[in-house]
Amino acid sequence: MLSWNNSWHSSSTENRTMEREIVASYEPKKNNEIRMFESSDEMATDLAEYISQVSEISIKERGYFAIALSGGPLISFMRKLCEAPYNKTLDWSKWYIFWADERAVAKNHVDSYYKSTKEDFLSKVPILNGHVYSINDNVTVEDAATDYEFVIRQLVKIRTVGVSESNDCPKFDLILLSIGSDGHVASLFPNHPALELKDDWVTYITDSPVPPPERITFTLPVINSASNIAVVATGEDKAKAVYFAISDGTEGPDAPSIPARMVQPTDGKLVWFLDKASASFLEAKTKNDGYEHPKY
């Protein structure tokens, strides 16, 4: 069910007022939610509040907040966290940063997700350098994937990163993803053999259809084991992929090949953050009732 509110609606979350012109709640599958926004600023504001609350709950329950990031425009949406009140109220000392995927380039390369994340986010908040787990750029892509999985396994042993109760996969508190126009998430592309991996936590590819060809990526079991997953989509070029990923009305061979459709938390919650353009293919039912912003 997709419900819309086309009028301004205010709701309070942790003493913070959130306002949006278009908001949606999508619940075709258990623990899935969809949110739509009129502007990028509204999306960034809501995403910051969402990340803040997941962080606070994770630190309260576990003593840590382990978040894995991806590339694309989503890092720019995290800039709100560098501003008041978050830059002062969040317990940055408990944050641990990982990457759900990375391009096999030097850290100072223009294509590096680490570089863009450092410039747009990490350099602006007091996260400890020792809590930032970037991917080794001094070895082959295969060795980098092996090394990264080893690092994560050590952190799971001491529970800096949680562990799934249903399998032995790491249970990140939040994995933040973007979606490509072809429906890829992280560096998991349509019809790629990496989608079939069950036992590996981190893998590598050398044939990405989007340059650069060599990449490191979390596997689907790791992504789906997270406590929280957020997928951010912007732009009309993502509309078809978003539709195939989340609409129950999709049929035929295209739907199963969309990696984003395979993102279904085992024991967690999935939230989609969409602008109007990326949500334009979705069938929506207009309602006049208000929408209460959920608490996490």
From Swiss-Prot:
Pfam families (alphabetical): Glucosamine_iso
Record keywords, A-Z: Hydrolase
Involved pathway(s): Carbohydrate degradation; pentose phosphate pathway; D-ribulose 5-phosphate from D-glucose 6-phosphate (oxidative stage): step 2/3
Annotated EC: 3.1.1.31
GO cellular component: cytosol
GO function terms (MF aspect): 6-phosphogluconolactonase activity
InterPro entries: 6-phosphogluconolactonase_DevB, Glc/Gal-6P_isomerase, NagB/RpiA_transferase-like, PGLS
A biological-process GO annotation: carbohydrate metabolic process
Top-tier EC class: hydrolase
UniProt xrefs under SUPFAM superfamilies: NagB/RpiA/CoA transferase-like
Recorded catalytic activity of this chain's protein: 6-phospho-D-glucono-1,5-lactone + H2O = 6-phospho-D-gluconate + H(+)
Taxonomic superkingdom: Eukaryota
Family: Belongs to the glucosamine/galactosamine-6-phosphate isomerase family. 6-phosphogluconolactonase subfamily.
Role description: Hydrolysis of 6-phosphogluconolactone to 6-phosphogluconate.
Name the record gives this protein: Probable 6-phosphogluconolactonase 1
Native species: Oryza sativa subsp. japonica
